[in-house]
A protein has these predicted regions:
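N-terminal helical cap/lid subdomain that shapes the substrate entry/recognition surface
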Residues: 1-59, 63-68, 84
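Structural motif
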Residues: 75-77
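Asp-based, Mg2+/Mn2+-dependent phosphohydrolase catalytic module
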Residues: 59, 63-67, 79-215
Length: 215
């Protein structure tokens, strides 16, 4: 899902449409969607570099996987211009990927599989069984499912969990576990092969998958 598609979906929510009519005396149009997207882009570009801090554990896990010869590709709802800001800023903080694909010149973004396929071409990976899609949203899970690759969801720090680091630390453990269980259920319902609590579990999971494939 691209950012403009998310904005378009927001406008289509009944309550949002009602509020728009009450304020402007008319239904929204595609021009309103485009204008909102332009404003969103300006705000985003002004602050984008400030939000490129890697999630705890990401840098270490990427380094470990790369040392094993695993290539790291990314799919994103951001545009290429946005990623031209994000990638260098993230690299300065230790997070380096081998390839990044946006949906700019493809038939569609997540959950369609095209960005995964483009990554496979760019990174010269011939078999879908050698690809693992790791993500924190239902769209990520479905992208992996639609591409026919291993699809793995992560809970902590995810959009699906919807908690900041501070909220995660201060939330009563029982409530946190309950929320995590609901996210896990949603991800499996979307077709995930596996769901992990944190990215730290990913290397061990990949070892397990490799062992299963070797049987």
């Amino acid at each position: 899902v691209t950012k403009i598609e998310e904005i378009r979906a927001l406008f289509s929510i009944e309550r949002v449409g009602k509020d728009f009519r009450e304020k402007y005396g008319r239904d929204y149009t595609e021009e309103d969607v485009q204008e909102c997207y332009k404003r969103f882009q300006k705000v985003l570009f002004d602050t984008l570099e400030d939000y490129t801090e890697p999630i705890p554990g990401v840098v270490e896990v990427i380094a470990k996987l790369r040392a094993q010869g695993i290539k790291i590709g990314s799919t994103t709802g951001y545009t290429q211009k946005m990623m031209d800001v994000v990638i260098p800023a993230a690299e300065k903080k230790g997070s380096r990927i081998d390839n990044c694909v946006t949906s700019d010149n493809l038939p569609g973004g997540r959950p369609k599989p095209y960005m995964i396929y483009r990554n496979m071409c760019d990174l010269d990976v011939a078999s879908r069984f050698s690809v693992l899609k790791y993500g924190d949203t239902i769209a990520d899970i479905r992208e992996g499912v639609n591409a026919g690759v291993w699809s793995v969801g992560v809970i902590m720090g995810s959009n699906e969990l919807g908690l900041t680091e501070e909220e995660t630390r201060t939330l009563p453990m029982g409530e946190l576990k309950c929320r995590m269980a609901k996210v896990r259920d949603r991800m499996y319902a979307a077709g995930a092969d596996y769901v992990v609590d944190t990215i730290a579990e990913l290397p061990m999971l990949i070892e397990d998958i490799n062992e299963r494939m070797a049987l």
